[in-house]
Amino acid sequence: MQGFGCGHCYSFRKMTSNTQPPTPAAIPAIAASHCAPAPSAWIVRFAHLLRPQGSVLDLACGMGRHTRFLSALNHALTSVDKAPEATRSVADIAETITADIENSAWPLTGRSFDGVVVTNYLWRPLWPLILASVKPGGVLLYETFAQGNEAYGKPSRPDFLLAPAELLQVCAGWNIVAYEHGLLHQPERVVQRIAAIRPGGPAAPAALLQA
């Protein structure tokens, strides 16, 4: 599982756009045409839940596949990762932070976002900070490896595998739009994933809550 290096590095280029937000139906085509490597199908499927042109935290962003995808949807990205080469790769389209969030101070204290995206990363002590980073009415899109993956390869340690229904327990009290735990292919892996809205904000239109 991905970790974080030490120190903090920040770079930011403010993005502005007069483009109208894409419709939910248009989002998969944007993902297919603008992003390589491809973003997670789960993130593409529920990106329409994010507030148009809203702020999004891409935590453990890796080489930025979701940063690029969400930037193409005109969101304002903050991308966090261990590797300087990873954050440098998206520094022209996002605020970037290189920080050791597992072993040093959380670099986003006092900040919250319209959406938080996390894929292929799990460090349970961060749960309270991740949840607090979502604004009331904001969206958490989370997908990572789960118990059962040990039959197919790494990660196989329980520390890095979600227990059955763990994301549902973590998001208890939130509006759960969708949840899955199962086997995916190409490559074969067992994942758990959730799309959840933090209570307290304006109600989302019913059409947006459809999977």
Question: What are the residue ranges of the model-derived segments?
Answer:
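Conserved class I S-adenosyl-L-methionine
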Residues: 53-62
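Core SAM-dependent methyltransferase catalytic element
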Residues: 185-211
